[in-house]
Amino acid sequence: MIQISDTAQTHFRKLIEREGVPGMGVRLSAVDPGTPRADARLEFAEPTDLLGDEWAVDCDGFTLYVDAGSVGWLDGAEIDIVAGSAGTQQLTIKAPRIKGEAPGDAASLVERVHWVVENEINPQLASHGGKVAVQEVSAEGVVLLRFGGGCQGCGMADVTLKQGIEKTLMGRVPGVTAVRDATDHDSGHAPYIPRGNAA
């Protein structure tokens, strides 16, 4: 089920009234669902834009149409308007299932490590233009990683590995015993913090 707050409903109703198109609603869909790049898209939908297989959610003064192929990914989503900086208001969509479900305990150690790296660690590293790839996961639970982008050659890579990545993997993935760096940091072209410049 999708929850849309009264504040968000009022916001959309006012926007739709301004458009003045009879029967206009709002369509919600998942973009790249089940991947780390997954996102939710909201857009106006005129009656002629609809395919007919959308799920309809009756709201105050309009209908929210959920793309049929997106329903499973958007189950449990919450749409709201929250206070932003400097007194502004910001539309938020929280869709806890949109990036997929974490592999269960029955999944292999390799699958669980890959999921955490792709869905939790790499999105954080991307803010610095970096990424990390899993090179190997040994039978003993040792994870061998290779840094890339702004993390390759970065003077803070050791700190990121020990205080960020290793801590996250060992805390979130039972069976991980250690995390090691297999990166050739000397060949990094655009490190976030060049080696020797780290504090």
Swiss-Prot record:
Which key words tag this protein in UniProt? 4Fe-4S, Iron, Iron-sulfur, Metal-binding
Positions binding [4Fe-4S] cluster in this chain are C151, C154
Q: Which GO terms describe its biological process?
A: iron-sulfur cluster assembly; protein maturation
**Does the keyword section mention Amino-acid biosynthesis?**
no
Q: Does the keyword Cell wall biogenesis/degradation apply?
A: no
| Needed cofactors | [4Fe-4S] cluster
Q: What residue range is the signal peptide? A: none
Q: Which domain of life is it from?
A: Bacteria
Q: How is the cofactor bound?
A: Binds 1 [4Fe-4S] cluster per subunit. The cluster is presumably bound at the interface of two monomers.
| GO molecular function terms attached to this record | 4 iron, 4 sulfur cluster binding; iron ion binding
- Please give the subunit comment from the record: Homodimer.
**Summary of the function given for this chain in its UniProt record:** Involved in iron-sulfur cluster biogenesis. Binds a 4Fe-4S cluster, can transfer this cluster to apoproteins, and thereby intervenes in the maturation of Fe/S proteins. Could also act as a scaffold/chaperone for damaged Fe/S proteins.
Q: Which family does it belong to?
A: Belongs to the NfuA family.
Question: Which protein is depicted?
Answer: Fe/S biogenesis protein NfuA
Please tell me the species this chain comes from: Stenotrophomonas maltophilia (strain K279a)
The record's gene field reads nfuA
